[in-house]
């Protein structure tokens, strides 16, 4: 233990760069974009939370695709080894290579995969056709806008060049299309068998791939069960 008034410090310190984003002092736009560039972290936390509470195989597969996408990004960066712009003004960044942008690749994978899921995987099951299409269009527009803004933030904050975020977006989009096709054609037919495994039953892993609109299904089933229990409770009180 150090004596009073003395500190024994390590020779060097390293920051946790996962949430470390720098922006120009006094720049409000840069400040907002710095927070926006943390979107991938928020999305990953959301996925983990969703998997813990829903335990659905397609969600697990989606997260697996995101992890694979990050691995591909790391591999491409270390093959190309293109430096970041301006000689690397951010000394605490995780890697000195910038081609392609991992933030851009992540966000475009997430947005394009979600876009394909909304329009090709989820199908209309009720009569509110207009409202169903409206919320899909609005959500898709929001996802694509978020992907663009996160990509733009990496250029604005001098973490990447335009070409680096552009190629990151292209790589993420292509990975999303490939992973969506692989999930639909290869993994989805296996989901019922995987859900029947003893370990899956132990952890309450479920498969909803045969349900066209999970949101509508869960809503109707929950509402019907709540009404049924309410009737039973009313009968007991009489």
UniProtKB/Swiss-Prot annotation:
A Gene Ontology biological process term: protein N-linked glycosylation
InterPro entries in the record: Dolichyldiphosphatase_PAP2, P_Acid_Pase_2/haloperoxi_sf, P_Acid_Pase_2/haloperoxidase
Role this protein plays: Required for efficient N-glycosylation. Necessary for maintaining optimal levels of dolichol-linked oligosaccharides. Hydrolyzes dolichyl pyrophosphate at a very high rate and dolichyl monophosphate at a much lower rate. Does not act on phosphatidate.
Chief location category: endoplasmic reticulum
Family per similarity comment: Belongs to the dolichyldiphosphatase family.
Functional pathway: Protein modification; protein glycosylation
Keyword set, alphabetical order: Endoplasmic reticulum, Hydrolase, Membrane, Transmembrane, Transmembrane helix
Domain of life according to the entry: Eukaryota
SMART domains: acidPPc (SM00014)
Catalytically driven reaction(s): a di-trans,poly-cis-dolichyl diphosphate + H2O = a di-trans,poly-cis-dolichyl phosphate + phosphate + H(+)
Gene: DOLPP1
Lineage of the species this protein comes from: Eukaryota, Metazoa, Chordata, Craniata, Vertebrata
Positions in coiled-coil regions: none
Entry protein name: Dolichyldiphosphatase 1
GO CC, alphabetical: endoplasmic reticulum membrane
MF-aspect GO terms: dolichyldiphosphatase activity
EC annotation from Swiss-Prot or TrEMBL: 3.6.1.43
Keyword Glycosyltransferase: no
Top EC class for this record: hydrolase
TM regions (residue ranges): 33-53, 100-120, 130-150, 162-182
């Amino acid at each position: 233990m150090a004596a009073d008034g003395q500190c024994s410090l390590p020779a060097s310190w390293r920051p946790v760069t996962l949430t470390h984003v720098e922006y120009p002092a006094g720049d409000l736009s840069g400040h907002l974009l710095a927070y926006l560039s943390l979107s991938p972290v928020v999305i990953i936390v959301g996925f983990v939370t969703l998997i813990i509470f829903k335990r659905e195989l397609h969600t697990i597969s989606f997260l697996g695709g995101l992890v694979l996408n990050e691995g591909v990004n790391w591999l491409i960066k270390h093959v190309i080894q293109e430096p970041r712009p301006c000689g690397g003004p951010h000394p605490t960044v995780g890697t000195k290579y910038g081609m392609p942008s991992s933030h851009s690749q992540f966000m475009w994978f997430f947005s394009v995969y979600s876009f394909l899921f909304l329009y090709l995987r989820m199908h209309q099951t009720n009569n509110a056709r207009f409202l169903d299409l409206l919320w899909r269009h609005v959500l898709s527009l929001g996802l694509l806008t978020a992907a663009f803004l996160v990509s733009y933030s990496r250029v604005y904050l001098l973490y990447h060049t335009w070409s680096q975020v552009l190629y990151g977006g292209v790589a993420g989009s292509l990975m999303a299309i490939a992973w969506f096709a692989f999930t639909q054609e290869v993994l989805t037919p296996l989901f019922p068998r995987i859900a029947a495994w003893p370990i899956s039953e132990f952890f309450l892993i479920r498969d909803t791939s045969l349900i066209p609109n999970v949101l509508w299904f869960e809503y109707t089933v929950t509402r019907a069960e709540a009404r049924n229990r309410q009737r039973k409770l009313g009968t007991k009180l009489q």
